[in-house]
Amino acid sequence: MGKKSSDPAVVEINDVDELELEVGEEVTSKKKKKEKEIRTIEDLPGVGPATAEKLREAGFDTLEAIAVASPIELKEVAGISEGAALKIIQAARKAANLGTFMRADEYLKKRESIGRISTGSKSLDKLLGGGIETQAITEVFGEFGSGKTQLAHTLAVMVQLPPEEGGLNGSVIWIDTENTFRPERIREIAKNRGLDPDEVLKHIYVARAFNSNHQMLLVQQAEDKIKELLNTDKPVKLLIVDSLTSHFRSEYIGRGALAERQQKLAKHLADLHRLANLYEIAVFVTNQVQARPDAFFGDPTRPIGGHILAHSATLRVYLRKGKGGKRVARLIDAPHLPEGEAVFRITEKGIED
């Protein structure tokens, strides 16, 4: 008992068992090695040089970018089947460690690394849990003159400050749809906050969007600028769209065009979310309001964009004019903050208490 049998047949069987075990271990080892070897998009299953080139041309040049894409997107840009696109995305997610479950305590630690940009107003910062968050879309809506664009100008200056002063040492991308960006106002805010106005202007990249298609294209081009500045001392940390819905509203009129408009707006918001999460930037969008003829009580206005925008924005803030030239900000929706209000002023410093 316990001794190895001298029977040749038994020895042979034992040897085969050991051989199969070794082969099994070798296959497992090779499989693990193969999984670890996915470093570039060419390493993904089904991605050859031609497909890789098409993906790169469309902006999908990293595993992370592919991991957060949709199968339909890859199908269109690479000319592959939806099934093949899904396999590529799943492999990219696994390689980039995206789309997997995480313990809540680990997720809490991850959220602690989220950056926040001061608005310039302590009361508004407190309402927003410390400022405008990175990895999120903050929507601010209100009537003309409520302070939406003034807040955007202030944030474009504040984000360039060091973290201890309320900034993120970052650059800004500004997509202007209504010709409301004013470099003169940036200079004024920067000067009154003790900054070099010329240096501040150098780190704001502005593009005018002339229609909704152009607006969506500029978001894609914004990613190129984000990548270009990624490893510099002033990476992009804030993307502003002022205003988000004006072109969509003017181009798609009537109930017959509503479905197409909302579908297009949903795609636009998905692209903004992808940039916010992939590059850890804050996305700040302004929105207009429209009258509610059926409202007999309460506020007679509502933001444009419907349920698509309501569910896509991480935080929603309603601005209105208050007494004595002051402005009132009301936090309408946030996943981690209670509703509340903050009062601020618009001065030569931009937004302040």
UniProtKB/Swiss-Prot annotation:
Gene Ontology MF annotations: ATP binding; ATP hydrolysis activity; ATP-dependent DNA damage sensor activity; damaged DNA binding
UniProt xrefs under SMART domains: AAA (SM00382), HhH1 (SM00278)
Keywords: ATP-binding, DNA damage, DNA recombination, DNA-binding, Nucleotide-binding
Binding site for ATP: G142, E143, F144, G145, S146, G147, K148, T149
Gene3D superfamilies: 5' to 3' exonuclease, C-terminal subdomain, P-loop containing nucleotide triphosphate hydrolases
GO BP term, pick one: DNA repair
Cited CDD domains: archRadA
Family of this protein: Belongs to the eukaryotic RecA-like protein family.
Annotated NCBIfam families: PRK04301.1, recomb_radA
Protein purpose: Involved in DNA repair and in homologous recombination. Binds and assemble on single-stranded DNA to form a nucleoprotein filament. Hydrolyzes ATP in a ssDNA-dependent manner and promotes DNA strand exchange between homologous DNA molecules.
Name listed for the protein in its UniProt record: DNA repair and recombination protein RadA
Gene this chain is encoded by: radA
